From Swiss-Prot:
The gene is pyrG. Keywords: ATP-binding, Glutamine amidotransferase, Ligase, Magnesium, Metal-binding, Nucleotide-binding, Pyrimidine biosynthesis. The active site is at residues 379, 515, 517. Pfam families: CTP_synth_N (PF06418), GATase (PF00117). This is CTP synthase. It is an enzyme of class 6 (ligase). It catalyses: UTP + L-glutamine + ATP + H2O = CTP + L-glutamate + ADP + phosphate + 2 H(+); L-glutamine + H2O = L-glutamate + NH4(+); UTP + NH4(+) + ATP = CTP + ADP + phosphate + 2 H(+). It comes from Shewanella amazonensis (strain ATCC BAA-1098 / SB2B).
Length: 545
């Protein structure tokens, strides 16, 4: 299969939405019957985002094969059917690590290792490998043109543009076209300078996507076309919209997909965006609204919980309600108690690491259990629910996780030292292992207990969900907790690890060790999030009646 490549760059400012634009174009091409994938090339020196602070970088998105990747890969999976894997995201750090490893082995036969050609060749090889087996591969370059960190990536795609030729490569550049209120007009000069910078590197953009808070007037598009040496029809206006799921229709209405198909000589059907039209209709026509309290420790940056936020919105679409998310600092729950949790229709405790705020999460689980408020725990959210139950129902005073208290008399959650990965290999770890290599990662099978809310939600005896955690429920306490009334509704493939828990005599108190948010999409939703939102809606109706 001959793969065509679209390289996406950004200029003027960061956070223009390159990831959303790339994903939207991919969605259109997929709707035309093409097999599309997307890659993200990150210029930072970290090997991967796995050990980066969520308040700086945002969420770490986990792929089926266990790669810890940039949150943009979450956008990609929510827009297209193709599943991402570790080939879809790599960093400067990863490239340098691999090149240096080869140098130490003597693979370069004593040559002087340089950015050109050794680093650029490694980047090109990964890009070509990631695109194998697809009609079109869209490659997003992180950062903005002019960043010193991005130069090796930009040089690599410049070389690929020459090597692949015009029939197999094209360049799409996102820029900002700001509106100045005092002048009463949009300004194109930042775009002109951004394109000038890109051309100085040797890359001439084929398509310009102009971001702004309003549509770009026709005369300004003509001006951009003239000064940036881009066809006028290839100057695309991408204004701010109230829903990112409107962007595919906005782009196809301006013929962006036709430009791509014509350039690559692709004969394919017209784009069928009916699924996206249905999503937009559901979003615009809710039958009510609910408020979900998200009790976390990284709430100052909502992107730290990006996939959870989106999964709640998707569940709202399926239940025809608007889901309002109230971010609650778990430390404020420690300080204010029940007052911090008043007025909610449901509580969600997402994943997290470290001791700060954990007692507030435990209090949130207690509040939900005692007040029959729908509760959904994810990863650490399951562990705190189990700790709370152990302390206050099973009578295990001072029960805790060894992550937070190594001297706890009842370590109901602990670090396991051996487990089987997705390929059946035995993995081992201990507390001295590097943080980047100590977690159970990726998609794994979970057996569901018949008659439970979990099995009812999935409509199946099993599910496959993605993991990202170091600590597990201590099997030593399972029978004691079961006797006290806790239901272990999901077990690992070998039935040795607890994957889900729930309370049988509660409207909806369900928690999982995995991260279901990573597989939720606007078109399909996710059964656990749908069940949680439905329970929250039912609780609201009971409260109002």
């Amino acid at each position: 299969m001959t793969t065509r490549y679209i390289f996406v760059t950004g200029g003027v400012v960061s956070s223009l939405g390159k990831g959303i634009a790339a994903a939207s174009l991919a969605a259109i091409l997929e709707a035309r019957g093409l097999n599309v994938t997307i890659m993200k090339l990150d210029p930072y020196i970290n090997v991967d985002p796995g050990t980066m602070s969520p308040t700086q970088h945002g969420e770490v998105f986990v792929t089926e094969d266990g790669a810890e990747t940039d949150l943009d890969l979450g956008h990609y999976e929510r827009f297209i059917r193709t599943k991402m894997n570790r080939r879809n995201n790599f960093t400067t750090g990863r490239i340098y690590e691999e090149v240096l490893r080869k140098e130490r082995r003597g693979d370069y036969l004593g040559a002087t290792i340089q950015v050109i050609p050794h680093i650029t060749n490694a980047i090109k090889a990964k890009v070509l490998e990631g695109g194998e087996g697809h009609d079109v591969a869209i490659v997003e370059i992180g950062g903005t043109v002019g960043d010193i960190e991005s130069l090796p990536f930009l040089e690599s795609i410049r070389q690929l543009g020459v090597e692949l030729g015009r029939d197999r490569s094209m360049f799409m550049h996102l820029t900002l076209v700001p509106f100045l209120g005092a002048a009463g007009e949009v300004k194109t000069k930042p775009t002109q300078h951004s394109v000038k910078e890109l051309r100085s590197i040797g890359i001439a953009p084929d398509i310009l996507v102009c971001r702004g808070d309003r549509a770009i007037p026709a005369n300004e598009r003509a001006k951009i076309s003239l000064f940036c040496n881009v066809e006028e029809r290839a100057v695309i206006s991408l204004k701010d919209v109230d829903s990112i799921y409107k962007i595919p229709a906005l782009l196809t209405s301006q013929g962006l997909d036709d430009l791509v198909c014509k350039r690559f000589h692709l004969e394919c059907k017209e784009a069928d965006l009916s699924e996206w039209e249905n999503v937009i209709y559901q979003e615009a026509n809710p039958n009510g609204e609910i408020t979900i309290g998200m009790v976390g420790k990284y709430i100052e940056l909502p992107d730290a919980y990006k996939s959870v936020n989106e999964a709640l919105k998707h569940a709202g679409l399926k239940n025809r309600v608007t889901v309002n998310i109230k971010y609650i600092d778990s430390q404020s729950v420690e300080a204010k108690g029940d007052e911090a949790l008043a007025g909610l229709d449901g509580i969600l405790v997402p994943g997290g690491f470290g001791e700060r705020g954990v007692e507030g999460k435990i209090l949130a689980a207690k509040y939900a259990r005692e007040n029959e408020l729908p509760y959904f725990g994810i990863c650490l959210g399951m562990q705190v629910a189990l700790i709370e139950f152990a302390r206050n129902v099973a009578g295990l005073t001072d029960a805790h996780s060894t992550e937070f208290n190594k001297q706890t008399p009842h370590p109901v959650v602990g670090l396991i030292t051996e487990w089987i990965d997705e390929e059946g290999n035995i993995e081992q770890r201990d507390e001295a292992s590097d943080l980047g290599g100590t977690m159970r990662l990726g998609a794994q099978l979970c057996h569901l207990k018949a008659g439970t809310k979990a099995a009812e939600a999935y409509g199946s005896e099993s599910c496959i969900e993605r993991h990202r955690h170091r600590y597990e429920v201590n099997n030593h306490y399972v029978k004691q907790l079961e006797k006290a009334g806790l239901v272990f509704s999901g077990l690992s493939s070998d039935r040795k690890l607890v994957e889900m828990i729930e309370l049988p005599n509660h409207p909806w108190f369900v928690a999982g060790q995995f991260h279901p948010e990573f597989t939720s999409t606007p078109r399909d939703g996710h059964p656990l999030f749908e069940g949680f939102v439905a329970a929250a809606r039912a609780h609201q109706k009971r409260s109002l009646s």
